[in-house]
Amino acid sequence: MSRYTGSTWKISRRLNYSITETGKELRKRAYAPGQHGQRRAKISDYGLQLKEKQKLRFTYGMSEKQFRKTFERASKLKGIHGEMFLVLLESRLDNIVYRLGFAKTRAQARQLVNHGHVLVEGKKVDIASYSLKPGQTITLREKSKNLKIVEEVLKNKFVRADYVSLDKQLNGKYVRYPKRNEFLAEINEQLIVEFYNR
């Protein structure tokens, strides 16, 4: 299954969960899109697990194949499987570019990475799924700071997490791995573990 490129607002409304983490999608119409969107059928255990998996997958904008691969990688790490999975997702380069405030959305952050605008430890990395380690620095190429979309977001200098830092020269740093209570509080990762372990 390829990465979804359609309307994030429709997906958010279908899942009754803001995949952009802003909540804007649900303010106007907090029900699924379409003619029968306001009906909420009773959901099975499998349906709950699937929905939770989709909420997380769409939040990070990943294909099913990538998502599953990351889940399997997390099973080999020390710690609680579900939590390790979330930490791996949160450590992706495109996500940290978003958390640093270099982009308005994860999709925009992924585009910046894919087009070669992002440097890790001073070297160009154009793989959105690149897994960062604490202590690594993340910056934009000098020329890239003049891009209109970048200039717009940098005016606000909005850092979206305590486990990343940004100085006045726009040098970002992945300070440490996040604690579970610091991000995506609405996600129940245990349901996702149950979904894949069926």
Swiss-Prot record:
Aminoacyl-tRNA synthetase as UniProt keyword: no
Top-level taxonomic group: Bacteria
Domain S4 RNA-binding: 91-151
Entry GO terms, CC: small ribosomal subunit
Keywords: Ribonucleoprotein, Ribosomal protein, RNA-binding, rRNA-binding
Biological-process GO terms, alphabetical: ribosomal small subunit biogenesis; translation
Job description of the protein: One of the primary rRNA binding proteins, it binds directly to 16S rRNA where it nucleates assembly of the body of the 30S subunit. With S5 and S12 plays an important role in translational accuracy.
PANTHER family, A to Z: 30S 40S RIBOSOMAL PROTEIN (PTHR11831), SMALL RIBOSOMAL SUBUNIT PROTEIN US4M (PTHR11831:SF4)
Subunit architecture: Part of the 30S ribosomal subunit. Contacts protein S5. The interaction surface between S4 and S5 is involved in control of translational fidelity.
Family from the record: Belongs to the universal ribosomal protein uS4 family.
Protein name: Small ribosomal subunit protein uS4
Protein species of origin: Phytoplasma australiense
